[in-house]
C-alpha cells in the first residue's frame, strides 16, 4: 500500500465470512509491554463516535453481528497490537458492502479513540487500568500460569522480554499515567510496521481501494529478528515452590536447535507433545 504499511489479500470461496486483521508490530521492550497492553484495552471499548460499550455494540450489530476484538502480545522478539473483525460476505447482504463498513469501523477504532488534549478519556482510562490490574492479580491464582511464568524467568531471566508476561510487570501497570499511555498509542499509530490481511470471497482490487480509508501514513520501520534464543547455561536451573494445592505442577523448558522457520520445526512440535506439552501426550 505504502512504505511501512503492508496488505495481503487472500481471496477464497471456502467461507461465508470475510476476516480483516490489522497488526501493529515493533521491536518488543519490557518497558513498553504494560502501556501497549493498556492501549489495546482502551481502543477496544470506545471511540470518538462510539463513546460507550452500548454504542460500540450497536455499531457491530448494524453489520449483522460482526465479531470484533483487539489483542496485544509478543511474537518472538516483536510486540503486536492486533485488530480483528469478521463480517458476513457481501454476497449475502443484498448489495450492502459490509467489508467497506468493517474497514470504516476499524479506522474509527484505530485512528479516532476517545481522547482529547493528549489524554484518553479519564473515566475510561481509570476503568480499563483497574480492570487490567485486576486481571493480572487473578491470573496469578492460576497455578499452571504461575508455574509457567516462573519457568520463563529461569530460562530467559526476569528482566528479558521473554521472561516477562505479555501484559508486562504489575508494578509498571500500577504506575502507568494517562499521558504516557497516549504517547505510546501515538507511537504505535505513526511508527509501527502495519500488516493488514483480508481473507474471504472478495475482489482484491476493490478491497485495496477500500483499505485506502485507513488513516495510516507511510513510515520507516526496521524490525529485528522475530526468533528468540536462550542464554547458554552451563547446567540446568531448578526451582521448587511448596504451596497448599491439591496437584503438583512440573514445567520443563529445553533449548533445542529448531525455530518456526527451520526444516525440523514439525519434529520439534512432536517432541514437545511427547514430553507432555500437549493434552494428547
Stretches found by the model and what they are:
Residues 8-10, 16-36, 53-108, 145-168, ...:
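M16 family metallopeptidases and their MPP-like homologs
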Residues 36-44:
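Active-site SXXK
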Residues 46-49, 90-93, 112-121:
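Short, polar/flexible loop-turn hinges at active-site or ligand-entry regions and domain interfaces
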Residues 57, 112-136, 223-231:
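Acidic/histidine-enriched alpha-helical segments
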Residues 103-116, 213-221:
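A common structural junction motif
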Residues 133-190:
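Scaffold signal of the M16-like zinc-metallopeptidase fold and its non-catalytic homologs
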Residues 162, 171, 187-259:
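An aromatic/glycine/proline-enriched structural segment found at the starts
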Residues 247-249, 253-277:
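A conserved active-site cap/scaffold subdomain adjacent to cofactor or substrate pockets
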Amino acid at each position: 500500500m505504502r512504505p511501512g504499511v503492508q496488505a495481503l489479500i487472500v481471496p477464497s470461496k471456502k467461507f461465508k465470512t470475510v476476516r480483516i486483521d490489522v497488526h501493529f508490530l515493533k521491536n518488543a521492550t519490557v518497558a513498553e509491554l504494560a502501556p501497549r497492553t493498556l492501549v489495546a484495552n482502551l481502543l477496544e471499548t470506545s471511540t470518538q463516535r462510539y463513546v460507550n460499550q452500548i454504542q460500540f455494540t450497536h455499531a457491530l450489530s448494524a453489520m449483522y453481528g460482526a465479531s470484533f476484538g483487539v489483542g496485544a502480545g509478543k511474537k518472538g522478539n516483536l510486540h503486536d497490537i492486533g485488530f480483528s473483525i469478521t463480517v458476513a460476505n457481501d454476497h449475502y447482504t443484498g448489495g450492502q458492502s459490509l467489508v467497506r463498513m468493517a474497514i470504516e469501523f476499524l479506522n474509527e477504532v484505530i485512528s479516532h479513540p476517545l481522547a482529547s488534549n493528549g489524554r484518553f478519556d479519564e473515566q475510561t482510562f481509570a476503568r480499563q487500568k483497574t480492570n487490567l490490574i485486576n486481571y493480572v492479580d487473578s491470573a496469578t491464582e492460576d497455578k499452571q500460569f504461575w508455574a509457567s511464568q516462573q519457568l520463563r524467568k529461569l530460562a530467559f531471566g526476569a528482566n528479558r522480554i521473554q521472561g516477562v508476561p505479555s501484559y508486562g510487570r504489575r508494578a509498571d501497570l500500577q504506575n502507568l499515567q494517562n499521558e504516557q499511555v497516549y504517547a505510546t498509542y501515538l507511537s504505535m499509530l505513526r511508527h509501527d510496521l502495519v500488516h493488514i490481511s483480508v481473507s474471504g470471497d472478495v475482489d482484491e482490487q476493490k478491497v485495496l481501494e477500500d483499505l485506502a480509508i485507513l488513516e495510516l501514513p507511510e513510515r520507516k520501520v526496521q524490525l529485528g529478528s522475530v526468533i528468540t534464543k536462550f542464554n547458554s547455561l552451563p547446567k540446568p536451573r531448578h526451582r521448587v515452590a511448596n504451596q497448599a494445592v491439591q496437584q503438583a505442577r512440573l514445567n520443563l523448558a529445553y533449548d533445542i536447535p529448531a525455530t518456526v522457520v527451520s526444516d525440523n520445526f514439525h519434529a520439534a512440535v512432536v517432541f514437545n507433545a511427547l514430553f507432555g506439552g500437549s493434552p494428547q501426550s
